[in-house]
Every structure is written in structure tokens, then in C-alpha cells.
């Protein structure tokens, strides 16, 4: 930051922490970052950008930024992990952050499936956390029983911990306990129906 430009770089060790070296700096304006490993590559998610970076050489160099394709609040700390089991036959990265671009509200967990070329294909209908209310700094992890633990700042600016089944995350359920699905089983956030048309929905809730 000494030049007035704020960019993320990595520091790595090849000898179990005896010595440390600085890796390459990413090309875009960025702040603190989180890294996860998947299929032999490193994936870097940074604050101040709706993009991610990929390294094929353990952090020595980084790709140009790759857009996620969805919007989230990048003025907030973010968290990401690689899930230990396959999702739809692919390695899955779980990425958590607030989805409200103007405030730290409406948490989401997005699921990105690693493709053969290293790119991420993001599933539709991210998992909803504290929709419409405060959701700020978070930490996501996998528990010993292969479920997902999410620790985050809630609407009272207190720490809340949720334990979530991976199937609920993949299917886009909600920690608010109630959600709506259309005939195809997709989660619906809103819908407009003309007066001469019909549509059917199913209201579901957590046990």
C-alpha cells in the first residue's frame, strides 16, 4: 500500500514455516483475501472485487480476475472453503458473504463447482442466511460429520453459529426456516403472475 495502490499478495513457505517468501500480487484493486485449494489449484477471493483469482503454481503467480457472475457486498470480509465430498460429481467451493450490495445484510452461501479448466460454475439459488437483516464478518468451515458450520455477525452484532446440511445449501434452502419452491424444485425469491395466468408453488420449512 506504500504506493497508494491497495493490492493483495501471498506469503508462502516451502519448508514448514522456517523461511517465508512473497508471491505475486494480484492485478486488481483488493484488500484482505481468503484462499482455498481445489483440484491442485489455489482460489483467491478478495475484498473490494466481485472476482476471484486462480493459481496453478501454489501462489507464485495468479490469473487475471475472473468474474463470479453474481453480485455481493465486496466491502466486507468474505469466507470460503472447499467441501470434502463431491457435489453433482464435481469438487465444490462454498463461498459466504452478504448479498446486499449497499449494506452488510442478507447473507448467502454460494456453491461453485470446479470445472475441468479450473473455472467455477456457480449453482443457482444460493443458500439464504438472515435475509433482509444484518450479516457481516463470517467464518465457514466443515464439521466432522460433513455438515457446514457458519459463524457470523447477526442483526444484534452478536456472533451466531449455524450448522447446515450440505444438501440444504446445494438446494438453496434458508436459515430463516421457510422458503418457496416452484414446480421444478427451484427456490423462488419473487414472482410476477399475470391475471390470466396460473402458477403453483410449494412452501417448505426446516424440521
Q: Can you say where each PLM-predicted feature lies in the sequence?
A:
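Loop-centered beta-sheet repeat module
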Residues: 1-39
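Blade-level signature of beta-propeller repeat domains, shared across WD40, Kelch, NHL, RCC1
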Residues: 137-176
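Conserved blade-ending motifs and adjacent loop-strand segments that build the rim/top face
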Residues: 69-77, 118-144
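Structural motif
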Residues: 5-9, 49-54, 103-110, 156-167
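Loop/turn-rich, solvent-exposed surfaces of beta-rich toroidal or solenoidal domains
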Residues: 50, 70-119
Amino acid at each position: 500500500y506504500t504506493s497508494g495502490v491497495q493490492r493483495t499478495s501471498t506469503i508462502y513457505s516451502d519448508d514448514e514455516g522456517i523461511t517465508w517468501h512473497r508471491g505475486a500480487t494480484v492485478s486488481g484493486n483488493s484488500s484482505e483475501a481468503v484462499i482455498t485449494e481445489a483440484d491442485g489449484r489455489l482460489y483467491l477471493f478478495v475484498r473490494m472485487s466481485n472476482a476471484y483469482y486462480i493459481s496453478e503454481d501454489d501462489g507464485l503467480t495468479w490469473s487475471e480476475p475472473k468474474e463470479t457472475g453474481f453480485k455481493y457486498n465486496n466491502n466486507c470480509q468474505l469466507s470460503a472453503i472447499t467441501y470434502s465430498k463431491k457435489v453433482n460429481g464435481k469438487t465444490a467451493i462454498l463461498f459466504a458473504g452478504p448479498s446486499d450490495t449497499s449494506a452488510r445484510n442478507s447473507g448467502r452461501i454460494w456453491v461453485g463447482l470446479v470445472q475441468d479448466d479450473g473455472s467455477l460454475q456457480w449453482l443457482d439459488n444460493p443458500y439464504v442466511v438472515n435475509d433482509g437483516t444484518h450479516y457481516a464478518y463470517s467464518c465457514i468451515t466443515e464439521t466432522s460429520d460433513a455438515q457446514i458450520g457458519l459463524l457470523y455477525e447477526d442483526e444484534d452484532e452478536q456472533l451466531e453459529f449455524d450448522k447446515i446440511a450440505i444438501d440444504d445449501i446445494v438446494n438453496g434452502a434458508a436459515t430463516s426456516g421457510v422458503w418457496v419452491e416452484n414446480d421444478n424444485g427451484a427456490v423462488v425469491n419473487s414472482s410476477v403472475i399475470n391475471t390470466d395466468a396460473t402458477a403453483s408453488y410449494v412452501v417448505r420449512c426446516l424440521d
